[in-house]
Design a protein with these regions (language model features):
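A short gly/proline-enriched turn/hairpin at secondary-structure junctions
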Residues: 32-35
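Conserved N-terminal beta-strand and adjoining loop/helix that marks the start
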Residues: 1-19, 40
């Protein structure tokens, strides 16, 4: 089954703007926030909750309703050639929907070893510099402008 070319990006952060980053297992040195494709018959919010659980072991539903928010930001980008085999033939672009998950403080997370090698909590400035994706960097920079 092919992936749907719709995904979520979930920036996990604290009130003082520390940001959780994960290092990709399939590309060591590529750091990112939680990301993942939407499954059929799944809402974007359900996708965000599922991806956070799969990639960090955190249950986003255990936090206040205001902790996980849809930032109403969409990014359309070209799918890297090396990852296009995951999508139906002819699919070249993905639409990413940005969410934030605010935790009261940095937490230890449980990584999915096939997906990520390690994690780190960084200031928003350092996190924006470290991520490989420009849309991820932009979302982290926008974090500093949000009112919590």
């Amino acid at each position: 089954m092919f992936k749907t070319p719709v995904s979520v990006l979930v920036v996990i952060h604290t009130p003082d703007l520390q940001v959780l980053l994960l290092e990709r297992a399939d590309h060591p040195g590529y750091w990112q926030s939680v990301t993942g494709s939407q499954n059929p018959d799944e809402t974007l919010l359900q996708t965000a909750v599922r991806e956070v659980a799969e990639e960090t072991g955190l249950d986003a539903t255990r936090y206040p309703l205001t902790a996980l928010t849809n930032w109403n930001i969409q990014n359309r980008y070209e799918i890297f050639q090396e990852w296009r085999w995951r999508y139906a033939p002819g699919v070249t672009h993905n639409t990413e929907h940005v969410f934030g998950l605010m935790l009261s403080n940095p937490l230890a997370v449980t990584l999915a070893p096939k997906e990520h090698l390690q994690y780190v909590w960084l200031s928003w400035q350092a996190a924006a510099e470290k991520v490989f994706s420009s849309s991820n960097a932009e979302a982290i920079r926008k974090l500093a402008l949000r009112n919590f």
